[in-house]
């Protein structure tokens, strides 16, 4: 499948005079446990990566096939995390921005502009444009969505070995029925987001 339509947003931005475009996306805003992960990716203009689209539309197998391809073909990429503690301290929105800042700081090439998935962003020290459903519409954001998702999934698989009673290897920390049942039986672990569990525990 051609990626031609996935370059439309970037092509418009190139037409405005920007030369180096970075895509930014996150994974893990919603889970009850673990970090939020962000990735920033700069792809060569017009690059074709067959099958590349929003990570949520892909199987885990396909994401893992694309992961090394994106890293290999990118001009630059960066990955940043914000921990469960940081999420509890500054809230999930600001923790997401922190993870994005850390991902952008990892780039070895400075972008002229960042395209960020969603409808809100902060000033990251460079021009920023938000793109609603950007992970389905922009090559750079789609690539970032895959790097963020696979990186976070792998971290949750590691945490599943340390905390086997919660089933992180299955739900990656999201609030599934099985996860809530494990919380009822075992209580929260040290890597759970306490602010996300207040309602569950009836706290205010």
PLM regions: where:
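RNase H-like, Mg2+-dependent phosphodiesterase core
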Residues: 1-204
């Amino acid at each position: 499948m051609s990626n031609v339509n996935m370059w439309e947003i970037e092509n418009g931005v190139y037409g405005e005079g920007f030369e180096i475009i970075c895509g930014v996306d996150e994974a893990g805003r919603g889970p009850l446990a673990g970090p939020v992960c962000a990735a920033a990716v700069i792809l060569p203009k017009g690059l074709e990566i067959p099958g590349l689209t929003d990570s949520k539309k892909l199987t885990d197998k396909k994401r893992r096939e694309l992961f090394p391809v994106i890293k290999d073909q990118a001009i630059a990429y960066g990955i940043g995390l914000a921990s469960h503690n940081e999420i509890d301290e500054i809230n999930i929105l600001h923790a997401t921005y922190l993870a994005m800042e850390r991902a952008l700081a990892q780039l070895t090439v400075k972008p002229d502009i960042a395209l960020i998935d969603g409808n809100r962003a902060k000033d990251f020290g460079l021009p920023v444009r938000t793109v609603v459903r950007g992970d389905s519409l922009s090559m750079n954001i789609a690539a970032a969505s895959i790097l963020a998702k696979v990186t976070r999934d792998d971290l949750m698989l590691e945490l599943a070995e340390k905390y086997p009673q919660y089933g992180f290897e299955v739900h990656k920390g999201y609030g599934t029925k099985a996860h809530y049942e494990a919380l009822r039986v075992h209580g929260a672990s040290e890597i759970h987001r306490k602010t996300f569990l207040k309602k569950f525990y009836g706290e205010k």
